[in-house]
């Protein structure tokens, strides 16, 4: 949409000599400004919101009402690399859902859920909530503010901050204004922020704290498209041109007529880009995954239905938002699915992954919850530590209850009529454990983004907590396969979402092949990367995932590894690393991380880390072993309580026990080339700050290979002589 007088308003230009908007006296009543905006934006002040009229901007415009399922001027191509491009949607005869936009999805939600609580946030130790009407109105105000700052069509608003209502307002407002939502991980370096912000042509960057603002100020000179920065959690340290608080953004947006925003909304089509998700990029720069409005609205509806997420008419889902919204799984689950079904989304503290998450879970009591495998593993380790410190009787009761329940869930997983002993175990012990975790009302617990060990899945089954897997990529808008209470098989990633398709190519004798996907979930293309897009999407429009898997007779998918992770030894043997790594961790409960090595080598070797406690302030691995690891040491005759004692002094008892455990794994291997012949224990567990784990705690294998190159080379030195 053209900017300037034709639209009935003018844009603010990026001008360092421009008077700062804070020089004008703010009108507290109209903005709802609070004195405590160092803690949270006054946009979510309860008293201010209660005065808002929900009538403004809620009438669906004629163009939106008249928009048919067929798209005007739909392009022939199934992919594009242009931010302003359009694609042909993968419409199927057996999936008749008409394509619709994010605004249409929100508008339809208002009709059903307008008065329900949409977002919950903590303020001064008290939970406050806003309704879907209020949510929608604020998003419109933010959209008008972005337009006033000069947001151009098919340019981005980048968001650099922890999960919060303002993150949601900014994301939805961006789409309403015709922009593209681009999340940036809070852990990103200034250089990473610069690359993403430049690549997506960010006109506006939204940050939460002064720390994140400093990153942007360092790189602003290298961002030719950037016109303004908006900060919401903390005030700027001083007055700066083109840096605004969220309240000032809202005030600026008042100059933009509602009709101007409606005109932009009316022109939006489902096959246009509205979200960019940047992959972590283990090699080279991250790729910008372009997602269309149809990708978002279709997945929010059907991907969640496959996971048995309920519409609020049946039961309002309550979820806790804490995983990075820059990741597609969290963004789809928390933000877009929430709007689709009228869920109540409650925001955890920024330090949730450092130990406070369980406090939020207890207070909110979610009905469904999602965590990456590492989060579930940390919960498991915490339960094991508490159990180890409990009295003899309580510990034995827990072990008995978990043993009885696990056996029941393994032998009769779908039997609702539990034996008396199972019901007694749940009543006396397990229900209390779930309540202590905040899962008393949680009916669906999901995981994704990385493989989960069999040990972790069996542990939670013993607590009567089924972990439902989903499988997909950023390139498939998240879930393409889903598990649910009615669609579950242990160790599988579920079945294909209705309306989507899957095929396995280049299958081996065991039926394992590369997983290829088709459907409304498939992305538009990689921004500005035609070669990479053509590598991912073939001539028939199938997405080649690079993941290996097999399908059973009932259509359940089992992931066996990644093509790029597949180890091809010097002898030509193809070795998937994940099953061997999981076997080692299952055999040796002292092991935290295991990474198999051997690509183009004569034999396999392995790097190991030990289970250690995390610093409560930084979430960094410490030198102290967990209670479970200490118990392991005691069982094998060691008095060690720290990693340095074991590695630095080469504790004979522990090293011998690990050697014997690996020998047991080797004994169960399919053939000798699958044997682990050498291994080493590292002095520090893998972590995000150490570079071995990505933002969702997925193992970054290439980084590990480079970081520990000297140790790895030492395994094979004898072979070179």
UniProtKB/Swiss-Prot annotation:
Domain of life according to the entry? Eukaryota
UniProt KW keywords: ATP-binding, Cell membrane, Cytoplasm, Cytoplasmic vesicle, Endoplasmic reticulum, Fatty acid metabolism, Ligase, Lipid metabolism, Membrane, Microsome, Nucleotide-binding, Phosphoprotein
Q: Does the keyword Disulfide bond apply?
A: no
Q: Give the PROSITE patterns listed for this entry.
A: AMP_BINDING
Ranges for region Disordered: 1-64
Q: Which PANTHER family match?
A: ACYL-COA SYNTHETASE BUBBLEGUM FAMILY MEMBER 1, LONG-CHAIN-FATTY-ACID--COA LIGASE
Q: What is the lineage of its organism?
A: Eukaryota, Metazoa, Chordata, Craniata, Vertebrata
Which compartments does it reside in?
Cytoplasm; Cytoplasmic vesicle; Microsome; Endoplasmic reticulum
Chain residues that bind ATP: 279-287, 469-474, 547, 562, 698
* InterPro entries the record matches: AMP-binding_CS, AMP-dep_synth/lig_dom, ANL_N_sf
Species of the source: Mus musculus (Mouse)
Q: Which GO terms describe its biological process?
A: long-chain fatty acid metabolic process; response to glucocorticoid; very long-chain fatty acid metabolic process
Example GO molecular function: ATP binding
Spell out the protein name for this chain: Long-chain-fatty-acid--CoA ligase ACSBG1
Tissue-by-tissue expression:
Mainly expressed in brain. Also expressed in adrenal gland and testis. In brain, it is present in cerebral cortical and cerebellar neurons and in steroidogenic cells of the adrenal gland, testis and ovary (at protein level).
Q: What's the family?
A: Belongs to the ATP-dependent AMP-binding enzyme family. Bubblegum subfamily.
């Amino acid at each position: 949409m053209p900017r300037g007088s034709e639209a009935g308003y003018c844009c603010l230009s990026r001008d360092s000599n421009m008077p700062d908007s804070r020089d004008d006296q703010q009108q507290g009543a109209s903005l709802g400004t609070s004195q405590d905006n160092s803690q949270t934006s006054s946009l979510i002040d309860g008293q201010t919101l209660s005065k808002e009229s929900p009538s403004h901007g809620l009438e669906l415009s004629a163009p939106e009402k008249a928009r048919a399922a067929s798209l005007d001027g739909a392009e022939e191509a199934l992919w594009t690399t242009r931010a302003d491009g359009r694609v042909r949607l993968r419409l199927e005869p057996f999936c008749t859902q008409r394509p619709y936009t994010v605004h249409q999805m929100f508008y339809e939600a208002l009709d059903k859920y307008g008065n329900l609580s949409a977002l919950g946030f903590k303020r001064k130790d008290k939970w406050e909530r806003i309704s879907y009407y209020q949510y929608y109105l604020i998003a419109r105000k933010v959209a008008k503010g972005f337009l006033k700052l000069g947001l151009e069509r098919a340019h981005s608003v980048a968001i650099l901050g922890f999960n919060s209502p303002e993150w949601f307002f900014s994301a939805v407002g961006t789409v309403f204004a015709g922009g593209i939502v681009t999340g940036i991980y809070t852990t990103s370096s200034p250089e990473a922020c610069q690359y993403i912000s430049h690549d997506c042509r960010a006109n506006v960057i939204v940050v939460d704290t002064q720390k994140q603002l400093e990153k942007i100020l360092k790189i602003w000179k290298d961002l030719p498209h950037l016109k303004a920065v908006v900060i919401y959690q903390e005030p700027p340290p001083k007055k700066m041109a083109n840096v605004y608080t969220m309240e000032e953004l809202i005030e600026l947006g008042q100059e933009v007529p509602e009709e101007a925003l409606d005109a932009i909304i009316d022109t939006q089509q489902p096959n246009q880009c509205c979200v960019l998700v940047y992959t972590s990029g283990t090699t080279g720069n991250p790729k910008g995954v372009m997602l269309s409005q149809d990708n978002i609205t279709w997945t929010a509806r059907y991907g969640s239905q496959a996971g048995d997420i309920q519409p609020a008419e049946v039961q309002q889902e309550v979820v806790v938002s804490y995983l990075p919204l820059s990741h597609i799984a969290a963004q789809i689950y928390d933000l877009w699915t929430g709007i689709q079904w009228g869920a109540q989304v409650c925001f955890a503290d920024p330090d949730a992954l450092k130990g406070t998450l369980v406090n939020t879970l207890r207070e909110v009591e979610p009905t469904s919850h999602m965590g990456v495998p590492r989060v579930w593993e940390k919960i498991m380790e915490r339960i094991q530590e508490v159990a180890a410190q409990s009295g003899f009787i309580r510990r034995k009761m827990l072990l008995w209850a978990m043993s009885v329940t696990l056996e029941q869930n393994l032998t009769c997983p779908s039997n609702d009529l539990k034996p008396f002993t199972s019901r007694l175990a749940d009543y006396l012990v397990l229900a209390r454990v779930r309540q202590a975790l905040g899962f008393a009302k949680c009916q669906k617990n999901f995981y994704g983004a990385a493989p989960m060990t069999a040990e972790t899945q069996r542990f939670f089954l013993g607590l009567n907590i089924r972990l439902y897997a989903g499988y997909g990529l950023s390139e498939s808008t998240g879930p393409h396969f889903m598990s649910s209470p009615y669609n579950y098989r242990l160790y599988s990633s579920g079945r294909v979402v209705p309306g989507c398709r899957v095929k396995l190519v280049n299958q081996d004798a065991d039926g394992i092949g590369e997983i290829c996907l088709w459907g409304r979930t498939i992305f538009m293309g990689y921004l500005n990367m035609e070669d990479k897009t053509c590598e991912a999407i073939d001539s028939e429009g199938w997405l080649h995932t690079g993941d290996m898997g097999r399908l059973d007779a009932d259509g359940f998918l089992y992931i066996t590894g990644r093509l790029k992770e597949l180890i091809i030894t010097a002898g030509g043997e193809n070795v998937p690393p994940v099953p061997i790594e999981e076997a080692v961790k299952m055999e040796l409960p002292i092991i935290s991380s295991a990474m198999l090595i051997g690509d183009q080598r004569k034999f396999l070797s392995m790097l190991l880390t030990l289970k250690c406690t995390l610093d409560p302030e930084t979430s960094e691995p410490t030198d102290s072993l967990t209670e479970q690891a200490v118990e392991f040491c005691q069982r094998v005759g060691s008095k060690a309580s720290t990693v340095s004692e074991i590695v630095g002094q080469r504790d004979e008892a522990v090293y011998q026990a690990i050697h014997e455990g690996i020998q047991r794994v080797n004994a169960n291997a399919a053939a000798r080339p699958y044997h682990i012949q050498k291994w080493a224990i590292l002095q520090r567990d893998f972590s995000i700050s150490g570079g071995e784990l990505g933002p969702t705690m997925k193992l970054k294998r290439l980084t590990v290979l480079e970081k520990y190159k000297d140790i790895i080379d030492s395994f094979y030195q004898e072979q070179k002589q």
